[in-house]
């Protein structure tokens, strides 16, 4: 039976780099929020153990694709049999992409989290969110927040999560044809890595910033130009390591008014924030139907 699952985009409302570990990973303080916008993932269970990605991404091999890696990681787990017993552990996976790749919206991590949650259900496993988050962390630091599906303040490498209440806001997200590698930004020698750690209450009361933004603006002139352009209408920041930027509004119409003015070669969308991610809502619906 074919099933379609949400794979939402996230924004980093702020992002501060507070240090670097001996293993190279960076210590962060960031606030994740979810948008009512994202990819759609269709999964068809197979009667064998093949994992087939029906919509490959250019320049990414099948075996290295995060979605395939997520499915195989779960496939390798002993599992917990549900009342239906042992089910086939294969799948055909298709992704309808709306979230730009290399944009800082968490598209790959979100896709991986959706696959872990969906296959956990479809294969009759019974792993908890906490157990899936541990698996997800092996795939990427952002995967756990998509597993839990709540707006959250993150510390550590992004894996220590504290749920946060976030008001309903509207966001204009803009981007060009630039794609940015997270690894490249975090390895840049000019990246600020010593922002003092602060309490969440202090961070929420202070102006929001992204420590990656100065480096990204310097290395990618198109991002710099876009941030300069939108500043005539509204404050804007980078999300993640870019290349997407965003502005916050109280109403949808305010955001759409600016979207209509964007220069040629600039793309974007308008979406509202949501306290619970669209993916988590999907699973709450599934659980209510089962019960």
Curated annotation (Swiss-Prot):
MF (Gene Ontology): 4-(cytidine 5'-diphospho)-2-C-methyl-D-erythritol kinase activity; ATP binding
Enzyme category, top tier: transferase
Protein's UniProt name: 4-diphosphocytidyl-2-C-methyl-D-erythritol kinase
Catalyzed reactions: 4-CDP-2-C-methyl-D-erythritol + ATP = 4-CDP-2-C-methyl-D-erythritol 2-phosphate + ADP + H(+)
Catalytic residues (positions): 10, 142
UniProt xrefs under Pfam families: GHMP_kinases_C, GHMP_kinases_N
Organism: Hamiltonella defensa subsp. Acyrthosiphon pisum (strain 5AT)
PANTHER family assigned to the protein according to its UniProt record, in alphabetical order: 4-DIPHOSPHOCYTIDYL-2-C-METHYL-D-ERYTHRITOL KINASE, CHLOROPLASTIC
Family: Belongs to the GHMP kinase family. IspE subfamily.
Pathway the protein takes part in: Isoprenoid biosynthesis; isopentenyl diphosphate biosynthesis via DXP pathway; isopentenyl diphosphate from 1-deoxy-D-xylulose 5-phosphate: step 3/6
Gene field: ispE
Keywords for this protein: ATP-binding, Isoprene biosynthesis, Kinase, Nucleotide-binding, Transferase
Assembly with partners or alone: Homodimer.
Chain's role: Catalyzes the phosphorylation of the position 2 hydroxy group of 4-diphosphocytidyl-2C-methyl-D-erythritol.
InterPro entries per the UniProt record, alphabetical: GHMP_kinase_C_dom (IPR013750), GHMP_kinase_C_sf (IPR036554), GHMP_kinase_N_dom (IPR006204), IspE (IPR004424), Ribosomal_Su5_D2-typ_SF (IPR020568), Ribsml_uS5_D2-typ_fold_subgr (IPR014721)
Keyword ATP-binding included in the entry's annotation: yes
GO biological process: isopentenyl diphosphate biosynthetic process, methylerythritol 4-phosphate pathway; terpenoid biosynthetic process
EC number: 2.7.1.148
Binding-site residues for ATP, renumbered to this chain: 100-110
